[in-house]
A protein has these predicted regions:
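Gram-negative bacterial Sec-dependent N-terminal signal peptides
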Residues: 1-21
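A residue-level marker of the well-folded mature domains of exported/periplasmic proteins
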Residues: 2, 21-312
């Protein structure tokens, strides 16, 4: 009888041991540094990260900060996250290459680092929209609307990887149509409405005939439309990337904005937190880069679009 009791105790211990080993690490402190919290894209991204992190641990502390596209400020924010003992840092890198020393320092401190929206050298993983595809579908729309012939502008922006990829995707499409003439592709409209307005004003003064403009994001597209209105220039097809709330309004109203390749910042953040949680628990992603597909939002289908502010 005594031997049987020892045997039962041994079996019970054996079954209990895997449970202890299987216990997962959970986030206690998550730091997020983003390009600009003045952009609703990053507001939605921050909300997605916080929601997913708190699903893992309702008591997790999540702090989202605006770097305002200032590299030194972003370095300081990352140092602050390190000092605070963060488990995970999500970084929207102001400069993909220059940010590497800060991320290396964070990783040496045992912190998981995941890039969001743009590449970040030194990150454990990155999650972003397939920006090449986004540029392709936005510019393919232009080609089709123009019947493969016309004068077009690629309105560039801050030289982060997302913008570079969008422009490259657009250029690839335009090159397939010999009768599409690119008047300009190197003017930086700063990713803002004001920048789009200023750059487009210059282009409208410089070029007597512009058939279409691809703007690298929605704020620039809205500024572009405003410039065309101010100078009474009509019949210009404007497309962009984001699928932001303002572009939903523009697509439903009397503007020259015709399409936007959508992003889902909320889901980018959710996926980034999930990957970060896996890495924290010893599971590496199959690929260091996770790309989420883009869908083209037009005047025809905008009524069915579930945008950034839709309930989750």
């Amino acid at each position: 009888m005594r031997n049987k009791l020892f045997a039962l105790a041994a079996i019970a211990t054996a079954f209990a041991m895997p449970v202890a080993h299987a216990q997962q690490k959970e986030f206690k402190n998550v730091g997020i540094t983003l390009g600009s919290m003045g952009n609703p894209f990053f507001v939605s991204l921050a909300k997605g990260a916080e929601a997913r992190a708190k699903q893992y641990n309702p008591n997790a502390k999540v702090i989202a900060l605006s770097a305002d596209y200032d590299l030194n400020k972003q370095f300081s924010q990352i140092d602050g996250f390190i000092s605070a003992g963060s488990d995970l840092i999500l970084v929207n890198a102001v400069d993909a290459k220059a940010i590497e020393p800060a991320l290396t320092k964070a990783k040496k401190a045992g912190i998981v680092v995941v890039g969001v929206d743009v590449a970040a050298n030194g990150a454990d993983a990155t999650v972003q929209t397939n920006n090449v595809q986004a540029g392709e579908i936005a510019c393919q729309f232009i080609v089709e609307k123009l019947g493969g012939k016309g004068n077009v502008i690629i309105q560039n922006g801050p030289q982060v990887s997302a913008v570079i990829d969008r422009v490259n995707g657009c250029k690839t499409v335009f090159k397939k149509s010999p009768d599409i003439k690119v008047l300009s592709d190197d003017q930086d409209a700063k990713g803002s409405r004001e920048g789009g307005l200023n750059v487009m004003q210059n282009h409208l003064t410089r070029f007597p005939k512009i058939d279409a403009v691809f703007a690298i994001n929605d704020p620039q597209a809205i500024g572009t439309d405003l410039a065309a209105r101010q100078l009474n220039r009509k019949n210009i097809i404007i497309t962009s990337v984001d699928g932001a709330p303002d572009i939903e309004t523009a697509l439903k109203s009397d503007t020259q904005v015709q399409a936007s390749a959508s992003q889902d910042p909320y889901m980018i953040a959710v996926k980034a937190v999930e990957i970060g949680h896996d890495i924290l628990n010893g599971k590496k992603p199959e690929s260091a880069m996770t790309l989420l597909p883009s869908t083209l939002i037009t005047r025809t289908n905008v009524k069915d679009y579930k945008g950034w502010q839709a309930p989750r």
